[in-house]
């Protein structure tokens, strides 16, 4: 029996399950602020004499198995701080719109930038050969990671390294998010991306993710921060009791 032609039929596909990951780029100005201040903090040339690699060591607060992770606390001028927050909360708000367009949340979950709270401080990771970030999640509602310095040697390792070039999943230095049932037919439980300089990813803070180590004798620099939802927090403060009865206004 010859199957009937598809022409004339309505065929639709849906992706109703799983989270949304948004990828875009940061501005040149934001990139310059984040990388310059991080490098100054690290090499002891930061204009703020009260911060250094000891005062801003952030490793005990993070899951990463890295030798250098620093917070940006005290690293920005007031003008820089306002610029950083404005751009990142704008992008985080756009993430809520993207989630709505992907039919993951209702329209009343879309937020403006002033309804997004950035959880300070931001932090920077200097990732070196053999270091990694184990599977973990973050606090808040939304998380992001952006890449400030990405050496070409890491991508070359995936293409030409003896340990990676024949693999069907070359993953040196790559980031992977995981969700749901791995191995289910017609489904994917993981999403792997290759970091690119100035690229930034937004995703649910509770979404598990990890970063694979690389062997190349080089160093990659990334920045992360989390965000909360001002509307949700205000509503939570108005609730009481086990059933979350809302306070009458």
Which residues make up each language-model segment?
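Non-heme Fe(II)/2-oxoglutarate
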Residues: 1-112, 123, 129-133, 171
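A short beta-turn/loop motif at secondary-structure boundaries
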Residues: 112-116, 215-217
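Double-stranded beta-helix
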Residues: 178, 226-249
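Histidine-centered metal-chelating micro-motifs
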Residues: 131-132, 206-210
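Catalytic core of non-heme Fe(II) oxygenases with the double-stranded beta-helix
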Residues: 117-200, 219, 229, 236
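Beta-strand secondary-structure signal
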Residues: 23, 143-145, 222-224
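Ligand-binding loop in jelly-roll beta-barrel domains
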Residues: 212-222
């Amino acid at each position: 029996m010859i199957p009937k032609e598809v022409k004339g039929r309505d065929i639709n596909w849906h992706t109703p399950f799983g989270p949304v990951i948004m990828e875009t780029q940061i501005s040149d100005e934001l990139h310059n602020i984040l990388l310059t201040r991080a490098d100054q903090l690290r090499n002891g040339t930061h204009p703020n004499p009260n911060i250094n690699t000891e005062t801003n060591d952030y490793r005990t607060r993070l899951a990463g198995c890295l030798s250098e992770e620093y917070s940006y606390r005290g690293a920005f001028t007031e003008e820089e701080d306002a610029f950083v927050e404005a751009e990142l909360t704008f992008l985080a708000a756009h993430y809520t719109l993207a989630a709505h367009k992907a039919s993951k949340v209702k329209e009343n979950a879309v937020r403006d930038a002033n309804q997004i709270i950035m959880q300070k401080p931001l932090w920077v990771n200097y990732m070196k050969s053999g270091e990694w970030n184990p599977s973990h999640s973050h606090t808040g509602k939304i998380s992001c990671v952006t890449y400030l310095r990405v050496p070409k040697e890491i991508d070359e390792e995936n293409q030409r390294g003896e340990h990676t070039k024949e693999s069907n999943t070359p993953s040196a230095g790559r980031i992977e998010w995981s969700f749901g049932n791995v191995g289910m037919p017609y489904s994917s439980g993981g999403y792997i991306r290759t970091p690119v300089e100035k690229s930034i990813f937004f995703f649910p803070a509770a979404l598990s993710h990890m970063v694979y180590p690389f062997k190349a004798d080089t160093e990659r620099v990334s920045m992360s921060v989390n965000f909360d939802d001002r509307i949700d927090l205000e509503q939570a403060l108005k609730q009481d009791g086990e059933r979350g009865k809302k306070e009458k206004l």
